């Protein structure tokens, strides 16, 4: 496809438009397409007919707002109504009613849906495009075997292969092969038609013997042979009348449905002119494909590259939602058919409203959003994460690949990805290369292909003309890959430029160029485009950086980056975290909750987000940026959101950093930091945790929320109000009661006296007691209560419990064990917090904030951090901010180094500080030891890079166990922080303890602290009375388990003692 865009490109495209356009396409076209497929339903006597009148369908605006749907844990959806009619054929009467089919979850402008109060997003999937592909493989003898694979719309495969004798065979789903003559005859063609419609009839006749002629003597014989090979389990199949229709329906229509995309690809690859609406595999397709396969055998064609993007298609949110809608309508059809038959059987008069229920559509979409692998909970750690999540492309999911089976060729970068899929941004681990990210300017075309924009170079017209090219079209053009700003310098006709043509990178003259790139960021995703000096980094470290930026925690005092790339403002705008003025006017009132704007004769109130929790427990908060009485324009920023300053993305802080070793505290990627970062709240972040509890109706009565909890200390209940809920604004510690709840419980008969039980039996009195089931604050949850929500479900019953949500705000300073990172893949763990007077200090007396290990730079080959560090120092001194596009070396050699040195020289000159730029060692400076005041021996690189605090924090990971739960079988402690588990002592840890000879510690690890039941029970009592812990006599439980498993294999294992005196054998039970 060759699409024409707008002339010029002053702004970037909307970064959320991929998701939103897909949903709009589903509402505009997908709904009507599936509704038109809904058949007319008749009863068995063909007296009543039910049908839908699709032209009158309507979607109703939701009755609740997005914020209320999140607050009340509801689904933000629209009700779908369609006109339906019942037609009595005898009397020709029509009863028409508007029926409610179900709820369809809606998508907001950010590309997300709210299902059960949770933001969810649907990921785009990359699949092999339906059509035919020719490939060549070597068999076990080293001979090339040519195959043609026909892929259906749902992923089924039909393979055609040609052997050494030029005989053509067909395999369905990689099962046993049959002759192509049998396949074509089963599809309805006779031998004469086959020979008339092929280019090489002599090849088809060459392997036609008596046995083969018998198989294709008639259509019934061919179908019987086909059925015998692929569907018959055993025995000799017979040919019933319905077998032909059944086989045509189940195989040739369902399994070989090409779809519109598949039909288009087949026509283009095989040079056919079959109508586009004929979406099923035809005999003509098979025969033409066989002709091309014969041509491949004799080197008269080109093989297909399966990994080229022209052979891939994007299964967007529109396709996924349309598939689910079609599935729901099939279920609805079966339900209506059964209801009509039941009504006729019991002689009831049905109506359209009685026949249709909303259950199929509602349950289908709830199941899709809750269980489908491509429907994921929106990651809302920071504004960048929200945008990047919606632009992911996945090879995984139904009909796709798996992380275990995907080959390296699929994961690798392909030349067709250029400008469409980012070569940097992908996941780490088993899914590397299988989950990618769209390039910034890429868009998804009508046929599911990824299109990339280019500027057309025209000698006739001086106007800039922009084209969107699909992967199948850009191979025919010479595309200049250099930046057009560099190309515009000097005489273009005399320049030699790098270009791309037919998957090859060439160097050609300017007059041979057809198209050129539009932007230097065109090839990268959003995450990679935010890395300054990315061209100086190794690709692996750039990958880590693009992933770690999505893990950055919004800080309480955000700060713009000194060195950026220029995309920070666009990301912040499209993330939805900013409050933008929709109309121009004057600010007449503002507070922390809202901004009131007067303009165009009306008053508009803009509510602000105040301490709202994200699903990663980070704090989403908006702060007003306008003053009362000021006039504003449409599109102006009213309030900054989390991790934004002045409308720009601000994920971290510019801190003073030195690259030097310091007493070994920063070895192996450890980081030494100053206590200034703690006391001045430089890296302080707010986190909001949600705790919930439900009330049920039990068999002994309903559970009660109350503040009168027996047998609990008053101190634990100090924060509860009269209703049993924690008071808003109170400070709570671990172990405090957040919600007081009592569950009724039947008392045990054995706990009462005999006369009491006799009296109750005579009078029939049942005495029940209550069990305390309060919501307690777990370890590590201390903080301030900021919100309490009591949600009452309509028609409250045991299946619709009441839910109470408690939100607690935590203030976290940076501490030892937290993870910090730069934007170049340079990450580390805080190892020590040093007093600021002991930190190394500069020649002007300023102490350094962080000390990084210089050995982490050369081996990782991420030199971009050094450029950013030095340029950040110049920007900090000169009070400037820099926005640098990548690959600036295309203008001239060493452009990045010249820029950094010139800015450092200017900063040194303006401030009269020669130590900022010293010609002997530019970028370095001599600094002093804060403990002794003596200068270090070597000059050190200092600067102001942009450092992020990541969500991997020690408060979420640190864990200790005194006692807890044990596994039922092995009787060993469970694993994991959530289960209050223990720390595993494995085989290598035992070797280490053995190497140091600590026998008693090793025995404790393997007995008292692990799975010796009797010994660990004695430890507590012995410790209390101050006695000596006795040694365990018998074996631990895991050894007993081993003995039992051996006995199940008929292997007896016992303990024998042989006396030294009389050699008697004493048997002891294990």
Swiss-Prot record:
Give GO BP annotations, semicolon-separated: DNA-templated transcription
Tell me where it mainly resides.
Answer: plastid
* UniProt KW keywords: Chloroplast, DNA-directed RNA polymerase, Nucleotidyltransferase, Plastid, Transcription, Transferase
* Superkingdom of origin organism: Eukaryota
Which GO CC terms are listed, alphabetically? chloroplast; DNA-directed RNA polymerase complex; mitochondrion
Q: Spell out the Pfam families in the cross-references.
A: RNA_pol_Rpb2_1 (PF04563), RNA_pol_Rpb2_2 (PF04561), RNA_pol_Rpb2_3 (PF04565), RNA_pol_Rpb2_6 (PF00562), RNA_pol_Rpb2_7 (PF04560)
User: EC no.?
Assistant: 2.7.7.6
InterPro entries recorded: DNA-dir_RNA_pol_bsu_ext_1_sf, DNA-dir_RNA_pol_su2, DNA-dir_RNAP_su2_dom, DNA-dir_RNAP_su2_hyb_sf, RNA_pol_bsu_bac, RNA_pol_bsu_CS, RNA_pol_bsu_protrusion, RNA_pol_Rpb2_2
Spell out the subcellular localization from the entry: Plastid, Chloroplast
The chemistry this enzyme catalyses reads: RNA(n) + a ribonucleoside 5'-triphosphate = RNA(n+1) + diphosphate
Q: Name one GO molecular function term.
A: DNA-directed RNA polymerase activity
Q: Which spans are transmembrane here?
A: none
How would you summarize the oligomeric state and partners of this protein? In plastids the minimal PEP RNA polymerase catalytic core is composed of four subunits: alpha, beta, beta', and beta''. When a (nuclear-encoded) sigma factor is associated with the core the holoenzyme is formed, which can initiate transcription.
The similarity annotation says:
Belongs to the RNA polymerase beta chain family.
Which NCBIfam families does its entry note?
Answer: PRK00405.1
Q: What does this protein do?
A: DNA-dependent RNA polymerase catalyzes the transcription of DNA into RNA using the four ribonucleoside triphosphates as substrates.
HAMAP family tied to this protein:
RNApol_bact_RpoB
Protein name, as recorded: DNA-directed RNA polymerase subunit beta
What species was this sequence derived from?
Lotus japonicus (Lotus corniculatus var. japonicus)
């Amino acid at each position: 496809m060759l699409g024409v865009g707008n002339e010029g490109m002053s702004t970037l495209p909307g970064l959320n438009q991929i998701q939103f356009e897909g949903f709009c396409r589903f509402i505009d076209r997908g709904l009507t397409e599936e509704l038109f497929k809904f058949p007319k339903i008749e009863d068995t006597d063909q007296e009543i007919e039910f049908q839908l009148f699709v032209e009158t369908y309507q979607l109703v605006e939701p009755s609740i707002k997005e914020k209320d749907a999140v607050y009340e844990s509801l689904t933000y959806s629209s009700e779908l109504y369609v006109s339906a009619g019942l037609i009595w054929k005898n009397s020709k009467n029509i009863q028409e009613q508007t029926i409610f089919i179900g709820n369809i979850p809606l998508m907001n402008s950010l590309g997300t849906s709210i299902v059960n109060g949770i933001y969810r997003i649907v990921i785009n999937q990359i699949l092999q495009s339906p059509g035919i592909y020719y490939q060549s493989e070597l068999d076990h003898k080293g001979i090339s075997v040519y195959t043609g694979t026909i892929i259906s719309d749902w992923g089924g495969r039909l393979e055609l292969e040609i052997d050494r004798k030029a005989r053509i065979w067909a395999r369905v789903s990689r099962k046993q092969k049959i002759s192509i003559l049998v396949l074509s005859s089963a599809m309805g063609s006779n031998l004469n038609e086959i020979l008339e419609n092929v280019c090489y009839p002599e090849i088809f006749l060459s392997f036609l013997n008596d046995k083969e002629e018998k198989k294709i003597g008639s259509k019934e014989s061919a179908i019987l042979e086909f059925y015998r090979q692929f569907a018959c389990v055993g025995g000799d199949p017979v040919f019933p009348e319905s077998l032909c229709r059944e086989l045509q329906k189940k195989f040739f229509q369902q399994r070989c449905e090409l779809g519109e995309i598949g039909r288009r690809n087949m026509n283009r690859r095989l040079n056919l002119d079959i109508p586009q609406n004929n979406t099923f595999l035809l005999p003509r397709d098979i025969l033409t494909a066989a002709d091309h396969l014969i041509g491949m055998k004799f080197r008269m064609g080109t093989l297909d590259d399966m990994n080229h993007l022209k052979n891939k298609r994007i299964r967007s949110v529109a396709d996924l939602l349309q598939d689910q809608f079609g599935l729901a309508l099939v279920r609805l059809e079966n339900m209506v058919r059964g209801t009509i038959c039941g009504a006729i059987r019991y002689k009831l008069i049905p109506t359209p409203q009685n026949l249709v229920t909303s259950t199929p559509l509602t349950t289908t979409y709830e199941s899709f959003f809750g269980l489908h692998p491509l429907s994921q909970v929106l990651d809302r750690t920071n504004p960048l994460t929200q945008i990047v999540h919606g632009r992911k492309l996945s090879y995984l999911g139904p009909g796709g690949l798996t992380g275990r089976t995907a080959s390296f060729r699929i994961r690798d970068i392909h030349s067709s990805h250029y400008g469409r899929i980012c070569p940097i941004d992908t996941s780490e681990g088993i899914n590397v290369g299988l989950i990618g990210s769209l390039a910034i300017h890429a868009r998804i075309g009508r046929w599911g292909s990824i299109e990339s924009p280019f500027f057309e170079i025209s000698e006739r017209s001086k106007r800039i003309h922009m084209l969107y090219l699909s992967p199948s079209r850009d191979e025919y053009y010479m595309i200049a890959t250099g930046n057009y700003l560099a190309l515009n310098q000097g005489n273009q006709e005399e320049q030699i430029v790098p270009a791309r043509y037919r998957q090859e990178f060439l160097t050609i003259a300017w007059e041979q160029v057809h198209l050129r790139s539009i932007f230097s960021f065109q090839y990268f995703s959003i995450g990679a485009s935010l890395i300054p000096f990315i061209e100086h980094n190794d690709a692996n470290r750039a990958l880590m950086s693009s992933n770690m930026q999505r893990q950055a925690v919004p800080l309480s005092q955000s700060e713009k980056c000194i060195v950026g790339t220029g995309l920070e403002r666009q990301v912040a705008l499209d993330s939805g975290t900013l409050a933008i003025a929709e109309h121009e006017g004057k600010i007449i009132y503002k507070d922390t909750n809202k901004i009131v704007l007067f303009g165009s004769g009306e008053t508009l109130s803009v509510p602000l987000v105040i301490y709202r929790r994200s699903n990663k427990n980070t704090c989403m908060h908006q702060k007003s940026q306008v003053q009362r009485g000021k006039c504003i324009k449409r599109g102006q920023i009213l309030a900054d959101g989390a991790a934004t300053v002045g409308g720009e993305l601000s994920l971290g802080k510019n801190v003073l950093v030195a690259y030097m070793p310091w007493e070994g505290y920063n070895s192996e990627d450890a980081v030494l930091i100053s206590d200034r970062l703690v006391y001045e709240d430089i890296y302080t972040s707010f986190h909001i945790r949600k705790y919930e509890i439900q009330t049920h109706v039990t068999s002994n009565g309903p559970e009660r929320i109350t503040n009168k909890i027996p047998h609990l200390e008053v101190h634990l209940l100090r924060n509860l109000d009269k209703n049993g809920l924690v008071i808003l604004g109170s400070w709570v510690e671990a172990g405090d009661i957040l919600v007081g709840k009592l569950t009724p419980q039947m008392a045990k008969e054995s706990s009462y006296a005999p006369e009491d039980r006799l009296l109750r039996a005579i009078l029939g009195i049942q005495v029940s007691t209550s069990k305390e089931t309060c919501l307690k604050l777990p370890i590590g949850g201390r903080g301030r209560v900021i919100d309490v929500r009591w949600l009452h479900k309509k028609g409250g019953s045991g299946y619709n419990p009441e839910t109470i949500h408690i939100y607690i705000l935590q203030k976290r300073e940076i501490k030892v064990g937290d993870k910090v990172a730069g934007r170049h893949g340079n990450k580390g763990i805080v190892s020590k917090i040093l007093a600021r007077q002991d930190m190394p200090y500069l020649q002007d007396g300023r102490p350094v904030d962080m000390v990084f290990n210089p050995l982490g730079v050369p081996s990782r080959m991420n030199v971009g951090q050094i450029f950013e560090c030095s340029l950040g120092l110049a920007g900090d001194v000169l009070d400037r901010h820099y926005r640098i596009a990548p690959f600036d070396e295309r203008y001239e050699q060493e452009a990045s180094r010249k820029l950094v040195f010139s800015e450092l020289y200017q900063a040194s000159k303006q401030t009269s500080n020669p130590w900022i730029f010293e010609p002997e060692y530019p970028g370095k400076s001599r600094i002093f030891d804060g403990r002794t005041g003596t200068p270090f021996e070597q000059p050190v690189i200092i600067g102001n890079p942009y450092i992020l605090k990541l969500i991997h924090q020690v408060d979420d990971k640190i864990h200790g166990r005194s006692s807890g739960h044990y596994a039922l079988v092995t009787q060993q402690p469970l694993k994991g922080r959530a289960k209050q588990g223990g720390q595993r002592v494995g085989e290598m840890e035992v070797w280490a303890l053995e190497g140091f000879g600590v026998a008693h510690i090793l025995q404790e690890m393997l007995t008292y602290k692990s799975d010796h039941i009797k010994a660990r029970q004695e430890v507590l009592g012995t410790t209390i009375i101050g006695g000596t812990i006795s040694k365990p006599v018998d074996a631990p439980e895991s050894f007993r388990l081993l003995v039992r498993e051996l006995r199940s294999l008929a292997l007896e294992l016992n303990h024998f003692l042989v006396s030294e005196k009389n050699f008697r054998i004493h048997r002891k039970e294990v």
